[in-house]
Protein backbone atom coordinates (compact mmCIF):
# COMPACT_ATOMS: atom_id res chain seq x y z
CA UNK A 1 0.00 0.00 0.00
CA UNK A 2 2.89 2.39 0.56
CA UNK A 3 5.24 3.23 -2.28
CA UNK A 4 8.69 4.61 -1.48
CA UNK A 5 8.50 6.74 -4.64
CA UNK A 6 5.40 8.45 -3.28
CA UNK A 7 2.96 6.96 -5.80
CA UNK A 8 -0.54 6.67 -4.38
CA UNK A 9 -1.04 3.01 -5.31
CA UNK A 10 -4.54 2.52 -3.84
CA UNK A 11 -5.84 5.53 -5.79
CA UNK A 12 -4.06 4.38 -8.96
CA UNK A 13 -5.56 0.89 -8.66
CA UNK A 14 -9.05 2.37 -8.23
CA UNK A 15 -8.57 4.60 -11.28
CA UNK A 16 -7.37 1.67 -13.42
CA UNK A 17 -10.36 -0.39 -12.26
CA UNK A 18 -12.64 2.48 -13.17
CA UNK A 19 -11.04 2.84 -16.61
CA UNK A 20 -11.33 -0.88 -17.35
CA UNK A 21 -14.99 -0.92 -16.34
CA UNK A 22 -15.80 2.17 -18.38
CA UNK A 23 -14.50 0.38 -21.49
CA UNK A 24 -16.31 -2.89 -21.03
CA UNK A 25 -19.09 -4.77 -19.37
CA UNK A 26 -19.47 -4.33 -15.62
CA UNK A 27 -19.57 -7.49 -13.51
CA UNK A 28 -23.01 -8.43 -12.15
CA UNK A 29 -21.73 -8.11 -8.56
CA UNK A 30 -20.73 -4.48 -9.21
CA UNK A 31 -24.01 -3.60 -10.91
CA UNK A 32 -25.96 -5.22 -8.07
CA UNK A 33 -23.94 -3.48 -5.35
CA UNK A 34 -24.30 -0.13 -7.11
CA UNK A 35 -28.06 -0.58 -7.29
CA UNK A 36 -28.42 -1.66 -3.66
CA UNK A 37 -26.12 0.95 -2.13
CA UNK A 38 -27.63 3.84 -4.08
CA UNK A 39 -31.08 2.88 -2.74
CA UNK A 40 -30.74 3.41 1.01
CA UNK A 41 -34.06 1.89 2.04
CA UNK A 42 -33.42 -1.24 -0.01
CA UNK A 43 -29.92 -1.56 1.46
CA UNK A 44 -31.14 -1.16 5.03
CA UNK A 45 -34.02 -3.59 4.45
CA UNK A 46 -31.58 -6.18 3.10
CA UNK A 47 -29.32 -5.72 6.13
CA UNK A 48 -32.27 -6.17 8.48
CA UNK A 49 -33.31 -9.32 6.59
CA UNK A 50 -29.70 -10.47 6.74
CA UNK A 51 -30.00 -10.78 10.52
CA UNK A 52 -32.35 -13.72 9.95
CA UNK A 53 -30.31 -15.18 7.11
CA UNK A 54 -27.09 -15.14 9.13
CA UNK A 55 -28.42 -17.55 11.77
CA UNK A 56 -27.28 -20.78 10.02
CA UNK A 57 -23.72 -19.46 9.53
CA UNK A 58 -23.38 -17.49 12.77
CA UNK A 59 -20.96 -18.64 15.43
CA UNK A 60 -20.78 -16.15 18.28
CA UNK A 61 -20.04 -12.63 17.09
CA UNK A 62 -18.82 -13.89 13.69
CA UNK A 63 -20.16 -15.51 10.56
CA UNK A 64 -18.46 -18.70 9.44
CA UNK A 65 -18.40 -20.78 6.27
CA UNK A 66 -19.86 -18.14 4.00
CA UNK A 67 -20.61 -19.41 0.51
CA UNK A 68 -17.71 -18.51 -1.76
CA UNK A 69 -19.94 -16.76 -4.30
CA UNK A 70 -20.55 -14.04 -1.68
CA UNK A 71 -16.87 -13.17 -1.49
CA UNK A 72 -14.62 -11.80 -4.21
CA UNK A 73 -11.91 -14.26 -5.26
CA UNK A 74 -9.10 -11.96 -4.17
CA UNK A 75 -10.39 -11.84 -0.58
CA UNK A 76 -9.72 -14.60 1.90
CA UNK A 77 -11.98 -13.64 4.78
CA UNK A 78 -12.13 -16.37 7.39
CA UNK A 79 -14.60 -14.59 9.66
CA UNK A 80 -16.90 -11.65 9.18
CA UNK A 81 -18.72 -9.89 12.03
CA UNK A 82 -22.37 -10.75 12.61
CA UNK A 83 -25.07 -8.14 12.24
CA UNK A 84 -26.20 -6.67 15.56
CA UNK A 85 -29.62 -7.67 16.93
CA UNK A 86 -30.77 -4.05 16.56
CA UNK A 87 -29.22 -1.34 14.37
CA UNK A 88 -28.26 2.00 15.90
CA UNK A 89 -30.81 3.79 13.70
CA UNK A 90 -33.55 1.60 15.14
CA UNK A 91 -32.55 2.64 18.67
CA UNK A 92 -31.96 6.36 18.05
CA UNK A 93 -35.39 7.65 19.07
CA UNK A 94 -34.90 6.19 22.57
CA UNK A 95 -31.23 7.18 22.79
CA UNK A 96 -31.24 10.77 21.61
CA UNK A 97 -29.89 12.70 24.59
CA UNK A 98 -31.22 16.13 25.50
CA UNK A 99 -28.33 18.45 26.30
CA UNK A 100 -29.26 21.76 27.86
CA UNK A 101 -26.98 24.56 26.69
CA UNK A 102 -24.77 22.47 24.41
CA UNK A 103 -21.20 23.61 23.92
CA UNK A 104 -21.22 22.13 20.42
CA UNK A 105 -23.67 20.52 18.04
CA UNK A 106 -22.42 17.45 16.22
CA UNK A 107 -23.97 15.59 13.30
CA UNK A 108 -23.22 11.88 13.63
CA UNK A 109 -22.38 9.92 10.49
CA UNK A 110 -22.71 6.26 11.42
CA UNK A 111 -21.66 4.38 8.31
CA UNK A 112 -22.97 0.84 7.72
CA UNK A 113 -20.57 -1.07 9.93
CA UNK A 114 -21.12 1.00 13.06
CA UNK A 115 -24.86 1.29 12.42
CA UNK A 116 -25.60 -2.37 11.71
CA UNK A 117 -22.70 -4.32 13.26
CA UNK A 118 -21.26 -2.28 16.14
CA UNK A 119 -24.10 0.00 17.34
CA UNK A 120 -22.83 -0.24 20.92
CA UNK A 121 -19.81 1.86 19.91
CA UNK A 122 -22.09 4.62 18.67
CA UNK A 123 -24.25 4.42 21.78
CA UNK A 124 -21.19 4.85 23.99
CA UNK A 125 -19.92 7.73 21.86
CA UNK A 126 -23.29 9.53 22.04
CA UNK A 127 -23.39 9.06 25.83
CA UNK A 128 -19.81 10.32 26.17
CA UNK A 129 -20.50 13.39 24.05
CA UNK A 130 -23.71 14.21 25.95
CA UNK A 131 -21.84 13.97 29.27
CA UNK A 132 -19.42 16.56 27.92
CA UNK A 133 -22.05 19.03 26.78
CA UNK A 134 -22.18 18.04 23.11
CA UNK A 135 -25.57 17.76 21.41
CA UNK A 136 -25.69 14.96 18.85
CA UNK A 137 -28.04 14.76 15.88
CA UNK A 138 -28.51 11.78 13.59
CA UNK A 139 -29.83 12.16 10.04
CA UNK A 140 -31.80 8.99 9.31
CA UNK A 141 -31.47 9.65 5.56
CA UNK A 142 -27.79 8.77 5.64
CA UNK A 143 -26.59 5.45 4.27
CA UNK A 144 -23.38 3.72 3.26
CA UNK A 145 -20.51 6.16 2.69
CA UNK A 146 -19.90 4.71 -0.79
CA UNK A 147 -16.36 3.45 -0.24
CA UNK A 148 -17.25 -0.19 -1.06
CA UNK A 149 -18.52 1.02 -4.44
CA UNK A 150 -15.34 2.99 -5.08
CA UNK A 151 -13.27 -0.10 -4.26
CA UNK A 152 -15.28 -2.00 -6.91
CA UNK A 153 -14.46 0.72 -9.44
CA UNK A 154 -18.00 2.15 -9.34
CA UNK A 155 -16.78 5.74 -9.10
CA UNK A 156 -20.00 7.42 -10.26
CA UNK A 157 -22.24 5.43 -7.88
CA UNK A 158 -19.77 6.00 -5.02
CA UNK A 159 -19.92 9.74 -5.66
CA UNK A 160 -23.73 9.69 -5.79
CA UNK A 161 -23.93 7.92 -2.43
CA UNK A 162 -21.37 10.24 -0.81
CA UNK A 163 -23.18 13.35 -2.09
CA UNK A 164 -26.49 11.99 -0.76
CA UNK A 165 -24.95 11.61 2.70
CA UNK A 166 -23.44 15.07 2.64
CA UNK A 167 -26.84 16.57 1.71
CA UNK A 168 -28.49 14.62 4.56
CA UNK A 169 -26.82 16.89 7.14
CA UNK A 170 -27.64 20.60 7.24
CA UNK A 171 -24.28 22.33 7.84
CA UNK A 172 -26.12 25.28 9.43
CA UNK A 173 -27.43 23.05 12.22
CA UNK A 174 -24.14 21.46 13.32
CA UNK A 175 -20.69 22.66 14.28
CA UNK A 176 -18.98 19.42 13.29
CA UNK A 177 -19.70 16.11 11.63
CA UNK A 178 -18.36 13.09 13.50
CA UNK A 179 -17.86 9.52 12.38
CA UNK A 180 -16.28 6.64 14.26
CA UNK A 181 -15.28 4.96 11.00
CA UNK A 182 -11.97 6.25 9.64
CA UNK A 183 -12.65 4.75 6.20
CA UNK A 184 -16.01 6.51 5.96
CA UNK A 185 -14.52 9.78 7.15
CA UNK A 186 -11.65 9.77 4.67
CA UNK A 187 -13.92 8.76 1.78
CA UNK A 188 -16.52 11.45 2.50
CA UNK A 189 -13.80 14.04 2.96
CA UNK A 190 -12.45 13.34 -0.53
Where are these regions (language model features)?
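Iron-sulfur-cluster electron-transfer modules
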Residues: 1-142, 148-188
Amino acid sequence: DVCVAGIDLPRLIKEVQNLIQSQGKRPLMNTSMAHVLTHRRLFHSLLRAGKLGQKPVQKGPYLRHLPHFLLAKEHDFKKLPSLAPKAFRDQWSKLEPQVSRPRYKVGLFTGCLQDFVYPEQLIQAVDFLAQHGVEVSFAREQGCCGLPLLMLGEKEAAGDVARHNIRAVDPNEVDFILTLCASCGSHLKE
